[in-house]
């Protein structure tokens, strides 16, 4: 019989392997070899399997896997068809959800009874439904009607039903930032303000951000006056009038006051916030002054020669110093009170300082019981309980027998329940006794209960009873409920071996269970759960099999804990380790206990005897005794088995090892031990990420990714409790077998779930108790809650059930029971309740209404379409309905396709081709005006706002979680929209037939999306291998958007990408995503459109990079993209993307069925104008893509009653379908092949689909706009915003055709110039702010008679005036903006020196507070020429000359890349500004991209041309000042540290003036590649980057740094791991990418180190992402304590100047006296004094001792003297020390020191010797020492991380007296010998304090500490003399203060 042919479908034919393809060569030899080898292999196979007498048949061919390539999303699974095995479909699992009422609100605005029902609905509807929040969707914000005051804030309860006013208990994690309180006091943060208000019960609120008086810190400035701008509240530093030049040229101001000169007048006016103007030169005359004395603080004002008293001159600053006046009004400061006096013309005397509103708090005198706190809620005193407890887990047993996580939780529960609960004892309670077999203690009842909820997981296990269980959780639930000892025998189904089941890893061999051997175990010890260390995990499993006990891998590495106290970290308590070990083993740490600090308080006498076998093989009488033994021995001990221990029955060893995981079908996991469950490491621990506490193992289901959870634990990774369970923490801390059931009483609880941390249930009003089962005295809990009648009815006749409950008689009693949650499939559709809330189905509505005791009925089937007041039903009535409300989706009886609504009153549905045509009509209606339609549409959608989320990060910013409702679906024809109050909540736009717009929130009103907002769209192309854990294979069916496969695949891809984008770096502007097309690629090519906020600054590379980062960190099976990722994830920057085809209204319900109306015109290639991508679109977009169609519903009105008569056929025309939208007029083209639309005002586009945004005029140098003549005879105020592409051009001009008068604004040499002439000569005012090409600038000017002011970008006004003579400005020409007509050029050039117009844009022009409508300039101008439209893209049009390439930068700035021979910002200059070189000497000249040249000054020179020689600063430190173009070139970091490639510790102190710039950079190459390390500022955030060869690690500071202040930053790298710390803030950790082949842990550097900038940023590594230099000052660059900013390390300095803004670098007034050295310490300093001087400023002289005095001691190398650190014995003799002798830095026995300070004088000839030592003797620990090594003095200290050695440059073995000063502050150290510059350094990141034994040694030590790697010199005693020893700024008496006093002798004289 011939073999049957194999049948395969073409698209399922498996691809040929590479081997077969290789052999398919048309070669006879190859064919012969192949046939021979195949025949030989077949013969061998036959012989090896042949047995005589046994016949076999060939195995039938396996049918093809029909589910391969079938993508099922949202929890559905693929199942083959029963009728047709060759077909398959996606079906939802028939899971039964728990009958639990825990309502949740989904992102589809529907309420579900619990989370399981939500997930079922997600699968059934095949759309993403997220958990929006706990509680029903219709619930209002509980804080909406609550007003909290006196410092408290509103906090909703966990169930969202109630709200409380609580005071903040801590401000940890709250945003910092000074705020001004309403009491006029500054607070560090708003949280601190609220805490203060709560604590003092004062009505204080935040008045302003920032300090109340921003000038508070500037009062000591003698050269400036600080004034707070009342508008911006920013301090303005104004020059004092006293510092004006002493010239006597009196002038008269317009306030009638004579001033010394013009400078004095302008400065006095500025200080008062006024613009004082000169009336005349000389003294004021009588006519210039007011005739009467001005009263009530009014000021004299002279206008047009008429002086009068005015209140306009009473101007006040913005400082907030509240004053309460007698009129009961609070004024911001006293000036405002004076202004009020002036305006009211009456006296308003002050009453007191501070605000008037000092209403006493209602909480004054109130007493709250049970630890509650009184807060003010809605104006009344209310006692509230504190709910939030911070801190670790420290369990206590309460007097109620309940275990609480801490004392705080106990007190909070006592307050909540209103009862007194005391701490009975430390540690957990044991109320239930011993709960066995995994049961948990229910403390309220004292019962042991079994958690029974198990998450479905396809991981069966074999139990020790020989039965197979669906999961390990099911096994433990069975063991608990049946109270039997049961454990997992093996994974998988049970397979018997003879009559037994092999357990603990044993395998069946020859009918006997044997244990496999470990022949080649992987290296690495592991710690078993029995406390034994095994050499490998394999040996652990072998031991478990041999001993037949359960042994799990507790952790990697040995079990022996680290010895406590072995090596100091430099900080922390010594007993921290012992405390942790004690706590881990069940003990309580008590320092006062007599039996030892670790107390094992176990009372086991009352526990019933129940023997257990311990893991140590010892039998204990109870489990309590085992725990006590575990605590006392402090060893790992657990119950190995129930009952007494028996001798282990050792299973025989298997002679050969079991098959390795490499021999399994899918190979090994990454641990090389666990067998993978599928391709791509599916089911492996590395991909599952199972929670180690909530799951049984690290493996998971290879298809769904579901881990094997413990009972009551849920989540994909088993990381949370299931609804209805709580206390996940108990699994971790108390070893619970799973989560604890909530056990809420259904009669008293409104929900079946509870709070996760406390287990409290949500009770009905009047019901109390943690489980809602308690009532007040005299009441009993019934079906209606707490009832006064305690009798319980017996029959249902006596019962009356409400809210849908039904009566049930059982156990002799009658009770009301709410309906079940289970509905038949026929009734599983959504329903709209009478409360306006959409519910999952009818049963869920009834159950939720019953449990919450609400009367809710079914309003309609399907989701709610408009707000319905509770209990009110819409009634029918005839009315005049707007047209668009009547346009409904009318479906044909024979058609299942819903149609797009028309824009007229009649709809003609499009029938299927096989269906008869059906005409459906609607009643006539009155058409609404466009304004009516717009207002109604606004009213419809205004409630589609966002709602509060659940707090989940994955929901943050989610489009569906935003609560956007559709709300715009029309009511049935003839119905009335009932509006009883505001709507509660609306359905999501995804419930509307036309779906959502591209913003993902707005429902589309029509298929064209006419109401949709604009979006910014990017197009991406992705090569996909799989999505949601399922492989993707391209089939032709995917190309059809109408196919089911396309729809399912599109929904899965869109949902996954939506998740990724919403957690990415671009999530703030991301709106939605839509799959455009699926095509063939390497696997499947997906083209997507990503829609963003139209104002976003993100570009296509940002979108692509954000998606790549999310793909790399997300779950591997979520979205599988072909590798390498960067080559298969691409987003396009430039492409033509027609707006009209960017989406259709295709919601999920409309899916593919909705026909999209498009034009039938053929757009020729010539008529299409390509434009820059990304495109802007206002089209609706849904979750799936609808097909393009050329059919459109007719829009002409037809008679309903008149039948249609066939007429002559004519060729269809393009305009028949009326394609022009929004009232546009359609005109057919003569060719008959297209049409054109004439759009109405405000519309544009091919079919008028675009909203024409207001245009900004653009000028090209010869363009201009002409407006009517300015009216500016005596006064003019003008504001203008412009963007220039060139540095020269006319902005504005108005002149006089016959006279000299004119007014002009122009750009000249890159600055704004304001000129005007009143007839007696021009005034020229030039701004000091440079104009940057491509950036928007704002200028403001004013003119009053001959005086004028000009300010650009908020600069201090530039003031000027025209020559005296005529004052008025006579203008008669047109006002020209942006340029001039040709006939005016010559005149204007002569007057302004500018003869060309502006090249750029002007977007705002305000004249005398009247804004000209430049956006509609076509209607406003008198004349125009050559004016275009200004684009948002700075390079459109191209501003660069000579064909230069334009590059767009941030904030609308561009950069022209000039070709050779062209220069300037737009490459318009042909002259090189550096030829000839204008710089002094050898300073190099650099051409700037913005135009001009820059001299790079070397060290010692400064100035624009390096012409200034800097004076020698002497001993002053050098602080480098950078201007954004300067830099320092130093030796590379690798030259300072030998092991820099492995690790690095660097510290930097800087002050930034600009938000961005490079701080330091060191690289390997100069081609933009290679390793590098960099630190840079990006928008005020620090970024520490380094690349070790595989990609850059980016570590970014969490908070932005403050500009203008000194900042200290610490950088650390060890291998691939790095850390960044700013100041004392938290450390931010990061890691560079990992490679599988090469470790990439070394940093290879070869180039110099650049600080503050670089000579050429294009040569830096691209991964550093820097393009600008640093603007600011750098004080310190320290590498492991070694200062790098010194002359010896600097190779080149370019334009670096000394920073003069620090006290240590001021030209005068050196703060350190008597030759002391000033050491910068960020913003402060420290003085290092020379010999003979001391004090903070070296102001104190040290009195020299006599030669023979014992205060000068001699040391002979064996003289070792001990002192108490930082204390003198003379002080110890005082019982009560004198206050003036106390010092807070010096304690009697300082053992943990944050700082050290030593000064001494020494004389010696020795080259070696230990001078001073602080530290423990005899062990390795922290120390600090002064020693002489090779004739130089060394300061060394070790705080626990790594020693630091500072070496002096001065030799001390000269037999001369030298003064030595050593200082340490935290990790910073300094050493100074004589007059040398101090040597400074720093220890690595880590400890900051020195832990010692409190002793200080002089002269040496008898024995050095063991283990310290110290030079030999430290072991040699000091030989020489010491005197004048100062310890901690205190003189040390060498004789009196000595603890050990060997034979001492004075130092001999020379």
Swiss-Prot record:
- Looking at the record's lineage, which domain of life comes first? Eukaryota
Which positions bind Ca(2+)?
Answer: 1822, 1839, 1889, 1891
Stretches assigned to the Kazal-like domain: 86-139, 159-214, 232-286, 303-358, 379-431, 442-496, 502-561, 594-647, 812-866
Site entry: Highly important for the agrin receptor complex activity of the 'z' insert: 1774
Please summarize what the entry says happens upon disruption of the gene: Z(-)/z(-) mice lacking the 'z' insert are stillborn or die immediately after birth. They did not inflate their lungs and were never seen to move spontaneously. An intramuscular nerve is formed and axons leave the nerve and branch but do not stop and arborize. AChR clusters were fewer in number, about 30% smaller in size and lower in density. Transgenic null (Tg/Agrn -/-) mice, exhibit atrophied muscle due to denervation and are smaller than normal littermates. There is impairment of locomotory behavior and half the mice die after 50 days.
Site feature: Alternative splice site to produce 'z' isoforms = 1770
Domain EGF-like as annotated: residue spans? 1211-1249, 1431-1468, 1470-1507, 1700-1739
Q: Which stretches are transmembrane?
A: 27-47
| MF terms in GO | acetylcholine receptor regulator activity; ATPase inhibitor activity; calcium ion binding; chondroitin sulfate binding; dystroglycan binding; heparan sulfate proteoglycan binding; receptor ligand activity; sialic acid binding
Q: Name one GO cellular component term.
A: cell surface
Database matches in CDD domains: EGF_CA, EGF_Lam, KAZAL_FS, LamG
Protein modification: Contains heparan and chondroitin sulfate chains and alpha-dystroglycan as well as N-linked and O-linked oligosaccharides. Heparin and heparin sulfate binding in the G3 domain is independent of calcium ions. Binds heparin with a stoichiometry of 2:1. Binds sialic acid with a stoichiometry of 1:1 and binding requires calcium ions. Glycosaminoglycans (GAGs), present in the N-terminal 110 kDa fragment, are required for induction of filopodia in hippocampal neurons.
Q: Which residues are glycosylated?
A: 145, 672, 827, 948, 1717
Provide the tissue specificity. Expressed in central nervous system (CNS) synapses such as in the cerebral cortex and hippocampus. Localizes to basal lamina of hippocampal blood vessels. Both (z+) and (z-) isoforms found in kidney, heart and cerebral vasculature.
Q: Positions of the site: Alternative splice site to produce 'y' isoforms? A: 1633
The segment(s) forming the Laminin G-like domain are 1254-1430, 1517-1699, 1775-1947
Q: Where is the Laminin EGF-like domain?
A: 688-741, 742-788
What does this gene product do? Isoform 2 and isoform 3: these isoforms lacking the 'z' insert (z0) are muscle-specific, have no AChR clustering ability and may be involved in nervous system endothelial cell differentiation.
PANTHER family associated with the record: AGRIN, PIKACHURIN-LIKE PROTEIN
> Additional info?
Mice that have excessive neurotrypsin-mediated agrin cleavage, exhibit pathological symptoms characteristic of precocious sarcopenia, with fragmentation and disassembly of the neuromuscular junction (NMJ).
Identification of the protein by name: Agrin
The species this protein was found in: Mus musculus (Mouse)
């Amino acid at each position: 019989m011939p073999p049957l042919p194999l049948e395969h479908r073409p698209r399922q034919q498996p691809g040929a392997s590479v081997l077969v393809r290789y052999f398919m060569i048309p070669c006879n030899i190859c064919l012969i070899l192949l046939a021979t080898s195949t025949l030989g292999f077949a013969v061998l196979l036959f012989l090896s399997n042949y047995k005589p007498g046994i016949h076999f048949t060939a195995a039938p061919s396996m049918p093809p896997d029909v589910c391969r390539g079938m993508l099922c999303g949202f929890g559905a699974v693929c199942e083959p068809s029963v009728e047709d095995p060759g077909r398959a479909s996606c079906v939802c699992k028939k899971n039964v959800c728990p009958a639990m009422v825990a309502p949740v609100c989904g992102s589809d605005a529907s309420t579900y009874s619990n989370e399981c029902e939500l997930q079922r609905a997600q699968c059934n509807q095949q759309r993403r439904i997220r958990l929006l929040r706990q509680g029903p969707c219709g619930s209002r914000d509980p804080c909406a009607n609550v007003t909290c005051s006196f410092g408290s804030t509103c906090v909703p309860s966990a169930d969202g039903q109630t709200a409380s006013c609580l005071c903040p208990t801590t401000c940890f994690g709250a945003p910092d930032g000074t705020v001004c309180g309403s009491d006029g006091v500054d607070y560090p943060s708003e949280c601190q303000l609220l805490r203060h208000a709560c604590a003092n019960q004062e009505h204080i609120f935040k008045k302003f951000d920032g300090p109340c008086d921003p000038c508070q810190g500037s009062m000591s400035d003698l050269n400036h006056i600080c004034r707070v701008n009342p508008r911006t509240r920013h301090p303005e530093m104004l020059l004092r009038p006293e510092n004006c030049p002493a010239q006597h040229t009196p002038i008269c101001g317009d306030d009638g006051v004579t001033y010394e000169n013009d400078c004095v007048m302008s400065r006095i006016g500025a200080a008062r916030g006024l613009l004082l103007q000169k009336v005349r030169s000389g003294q004021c005359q009588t006519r210039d002054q007011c005739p009467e004395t001005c009263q009530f603080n009014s000021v004299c004002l002279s206008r047009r020669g008429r002086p009068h008293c005015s209140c306009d001159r009473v101007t006040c600053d913005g400082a907030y110093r509240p004053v309460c006046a007698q009129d009961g009004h609070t004024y911001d400061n006293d000036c405002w009170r004076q202004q009020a006096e002036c305006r009211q013309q009456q006296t308003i005397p002050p009453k007191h300082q501070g605000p008037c509103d000092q209403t006493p708090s209602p909480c004054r005198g109130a007493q709250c019981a049970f630890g509650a706190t009184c807060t003010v809620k809605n104006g009344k005193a209310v006692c509230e309980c504190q709910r939030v407890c911070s801190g670790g887990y420290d369990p206590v047993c309460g007097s109620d027998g309940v275990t609480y996580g801490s004392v705080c939780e106990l007190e909070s529960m006592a307050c909540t329940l209103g009862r007194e609960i005391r701490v009975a004892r430390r540690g957990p309670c044991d109320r239930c006794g011993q709960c066995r077999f995994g049961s948990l203690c229910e403390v309220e009842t004292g019962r042991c209960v079994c958690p029974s909820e198990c998450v479905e997981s396809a991981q069966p296990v074999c139990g020790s009873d020989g039965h197979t269980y669906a999961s390990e959780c099911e096994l433990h639930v069975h063991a608990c409920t049946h109270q039997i000892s049961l454990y997992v025998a093996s994974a998988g189904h049970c397979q018997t071996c003879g009559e037994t089941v092999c357990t603990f890893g044993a395998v069946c061999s020859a009918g006997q269970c044997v244990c496999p051997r470990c022949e080649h175990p992987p290296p690495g010890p592991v710690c078993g759960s029995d406390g034994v260390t095994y050499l490998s995990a394999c040996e652990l499993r072998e031991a478990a099999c041999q001993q037949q006990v359960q042994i799990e891998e507790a952790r990697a590495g040995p079990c022996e804990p680290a010895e406590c106290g072995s090596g100091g970290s430099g900080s922390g308590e010594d007993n921290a380790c012992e405390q942790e070990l004690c706590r881990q083993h069940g003990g309580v740490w008590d320092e006062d206990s007599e039996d030892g600090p670790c107390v094992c308080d176990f009372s086991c006498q009352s526990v019933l005897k129940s023997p257990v076998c311990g893991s140590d093989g010892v039998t204990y009488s109870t489990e309590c005794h085992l725990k006590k033994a575990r605590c006392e021995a402090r060893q790992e001990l657990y119950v190995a088995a129930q009952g007494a221990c028996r001798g282990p029955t050792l299973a025989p060893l298997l002679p050969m090892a079991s098959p390795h995981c490499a021999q399994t079908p899918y190979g090994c996991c990454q641990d090389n031990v666990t067998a993978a469950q599928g391709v791509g490491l599916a089911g492996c621990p590395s991909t599952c990420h199972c929670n180690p506490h909530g799951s049984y193992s690290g493996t998971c289901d290879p298809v769904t990714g579901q881990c094997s959870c413990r009972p009551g634990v849920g989540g994909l990774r088993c990381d949370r409790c299931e609804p209805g369970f709580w206390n996940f923490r108990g699994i971790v801390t108390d070893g619970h077998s799973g989560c604890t059931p909530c056990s809420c009483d259904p009669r008293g609880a409104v929900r079946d779930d509870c709070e996760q941390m406390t287990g409290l249930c949500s009770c009905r009003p009047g019901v109390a108790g943690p489980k809602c089962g308690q009532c007040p005295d005299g009441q009993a809990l019934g079906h209606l809650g707490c009832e006064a009648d305690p009798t319980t009815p017996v029959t249902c006749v006596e019962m009356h059930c409400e809210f849908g409950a039904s009566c049930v008689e059982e156990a002799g009693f009658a009770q009301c029971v709410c309906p079940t949650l289970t509905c038949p499939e026929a009734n599983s559709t959504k329903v709209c309740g009478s409360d306006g809330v959409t519910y999952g189905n009818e049963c869920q509505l009834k159950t939720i209404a019953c449990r919450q005791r609400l009367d809710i009925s079914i309003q309609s089937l399907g989701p709610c379409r408009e707000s319905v007041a509770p209990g009110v039903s819409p009634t029918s009535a005839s009315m005049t309905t707007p047209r668009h409300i009547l346009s409904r989706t009318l479906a044909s009886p024979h058609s299942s396709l819903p149609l797009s609504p028309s824009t007229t009153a009649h709809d003609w549905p499009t029938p299927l081709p096989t269906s008869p045509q059906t005409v459906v009509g609607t009643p006539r209606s009155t058409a609404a005006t466009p304004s009516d339609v717009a207002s109604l549409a606004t009213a419809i959608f205004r409630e589609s706002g966002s709602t509060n989320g659940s707090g989940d990060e994955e929901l943050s910013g989610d489009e569906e979680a935003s609560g956007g409702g559709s709300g715009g679906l029309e009511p049935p024809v003839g119905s009335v929209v009932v509006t009883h109050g505001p709507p509660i909540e609306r359905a999501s736009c995804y419930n509307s037939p036309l779906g959502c717009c591209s913003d993902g929130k707005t429902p589309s009103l029509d298929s064209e999306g006419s109401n949709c907002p604009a979006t910014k769209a990017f197009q991406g192309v992705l090569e996909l291998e799989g999505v949601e854990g399922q492989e993707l294979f391209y089939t032709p069916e995917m190309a059809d958007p109408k196919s089911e496969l396309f729809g399912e695949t599109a929904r899965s891809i869109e949902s996954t990408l939506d998740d990724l984008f919403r957690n990415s770096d671009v999530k703030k502007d991301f709106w939605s995503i839509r799959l455009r097309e699926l095509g063939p690629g390497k696997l499947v090519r997906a083209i997507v459109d990503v829609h963003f906020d139209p104002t976003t600054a993100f570009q296509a590379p940002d979108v692509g990079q954000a998606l790549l980062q999310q793909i790399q960190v997300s779950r591997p099976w979520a979205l599988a993209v072909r590798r390498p990722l960067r080559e298969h994830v691409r987003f396009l920057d430039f492409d033509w993307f027609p707006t009209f085809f960017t989406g259709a209204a295709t919601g999920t319900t409309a899916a593919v069925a909705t026909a999209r109306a498009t034009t039938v015109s053929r757009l020729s290639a010539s008529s299409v104008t390509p434009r820059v991508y990304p495109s802007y679109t206002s089209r609706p977009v849904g979750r799936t893509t609808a097909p393009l169609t050329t059919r459109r519903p007719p829009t002409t009105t037809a008679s309903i009653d008149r039948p249609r008569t066939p007429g002559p056929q004519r060729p269809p025309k393009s305009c028949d379908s009326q394609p022009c939208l929004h009232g546009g007029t359609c005109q057919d083209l003569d060719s008959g092949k297209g049409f054109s639309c004439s759009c109405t005002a405000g519309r544009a586009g091919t079919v008028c689909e675009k909203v024409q945004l207001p245009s900004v005029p653009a000028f090209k140098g010869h363009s201009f706009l002409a407006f009517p003549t300015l009216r500016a005879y005596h006064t003019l105020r003008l504001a203008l915003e412009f963007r220039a592409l060139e540095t020269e051009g006319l902005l504005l001009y108005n002149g006089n055709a016959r006279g000299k008068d004119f007014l002009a604004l122009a750009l000249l040499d890159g600055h704004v110039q304001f000129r005007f002439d009143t007839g007696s000569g021009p005034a020229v005012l030039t701004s000091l702010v440079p104009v940057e090409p491509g950036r928007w600038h704002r200028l403001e000017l004013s003119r009053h008679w001959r005086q004028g002011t000009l300010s650009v970008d908020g600069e201090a006004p530039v003031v000027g005036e025209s020559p005296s003579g005529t004052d008025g400005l006579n203008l008669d020409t047109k006002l020209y903006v942006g340029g001039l007509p040709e006939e005016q050029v010559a005149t204007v050039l002569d007057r302004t020196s500018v003869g060309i117009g502006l090249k750029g844009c002007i977007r705002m022009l305000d004249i005398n507070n009247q804004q000209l409508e430049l956006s509609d300039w076509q209607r406003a101008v008198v004349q125009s020429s050559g004016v275009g439209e200004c684009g948002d893209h700075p390079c459109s049009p191209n501003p660069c000359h000579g064909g230069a390439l334009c590059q767009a930068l941030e904030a609308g700035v561009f950069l022209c890349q000039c070709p050779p021979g062209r220069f300037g910002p737009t490459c318009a200059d042909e002259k090189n500004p550096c030829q000839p070189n204008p710089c002094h000497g050898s300073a190099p000249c650099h051409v700037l991209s913005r135009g001009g040249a820059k001299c790079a000054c070397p060290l010692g020179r400064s100035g624009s041309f390096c012409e200034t020689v800097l004076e020698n600063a002497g001993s002053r430190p050098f602080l480098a000042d950078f201007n954004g173009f300067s830099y320092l070139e130093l030796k590379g970091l690798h030259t300072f540290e030998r092991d820099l490639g492995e690790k690095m510790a660097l510290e930097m102190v800087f002050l930034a003036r600009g938000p961005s710039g490079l701080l330091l950079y060191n690289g390997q190459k100069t081609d933009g590649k290679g390793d590098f390390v960099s630190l840079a500022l990006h928008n005020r955030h620090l970024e520490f980057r380094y690349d070790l060869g595989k990609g850059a690690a980016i570590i970014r500071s969490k908070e932005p740094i403050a500009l203008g202040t000194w900042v200290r930053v610490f950088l650390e790298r060890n291998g691939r791991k790095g850390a960044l710390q700013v100041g004392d803030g938290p450390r931010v950790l990061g890691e560079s990418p990992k490679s599988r082949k090469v470790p990439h842990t070394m940093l290879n550097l070869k180039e110099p180190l650049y600080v503050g900038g670089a000579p050429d940023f294009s040569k830096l590594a691209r991964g550093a992402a820097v393009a600008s230099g640093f603007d600011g000052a750098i004080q310190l660059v320290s590498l492991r304590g070694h200062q790098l900013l010194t002359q010896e390390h600097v190779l080149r300095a370019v334009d670096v100047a000394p920073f003069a803004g620090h006290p240590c670098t001021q030209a005068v007034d050196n703060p350190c006296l008597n030759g002391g050295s000033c050491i910068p310490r960020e913003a402060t300093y420290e003085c290092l004094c020379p010999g003979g001087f001391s004090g903070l400023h070296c102001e104190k002289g040290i009195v020299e001792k006599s030669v023979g005095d014992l205060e000068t001691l001699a040391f002979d190398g064996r003289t070792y003297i001990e002192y108490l650190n930082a204390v003198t014995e003379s002080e110890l003799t005082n019982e009560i020390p004198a206050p003036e002798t106390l010092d807070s830095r010096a304690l009697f026995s300082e053992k943990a020191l944050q700082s050290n300070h030593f000064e001494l004088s020494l004389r010696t000839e020795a080259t070696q010797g230990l001078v001073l030592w602080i530290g423990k003797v005899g062990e390795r620990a922290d120390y600090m020492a002064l020693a002489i090594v090779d004739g130089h003095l060394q300061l060394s200290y070790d705080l626990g991380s790594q020693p630091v050695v500072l070496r002096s440059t001065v030799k001390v073995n000269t037999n001369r007296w030298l003064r030595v000063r050593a200082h340490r502050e935290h990790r910073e150290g300094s050493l100074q010998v004589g007059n040398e510059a101090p040597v400074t350094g720093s220890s690595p990141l880590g400890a900051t304090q020195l832990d010692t034994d409190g002793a200080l040694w002089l002269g040496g030590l008898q024995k050095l500490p063991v283990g310290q790697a110290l030079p030999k010199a430290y072991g040699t005693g000091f030989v020489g003399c010491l005197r004048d020893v100062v310890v901690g700024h205190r003189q040390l008496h060498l004789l009196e203060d000595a603890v050990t006093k060997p034979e001492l002798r004075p130092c001999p004289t020379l």
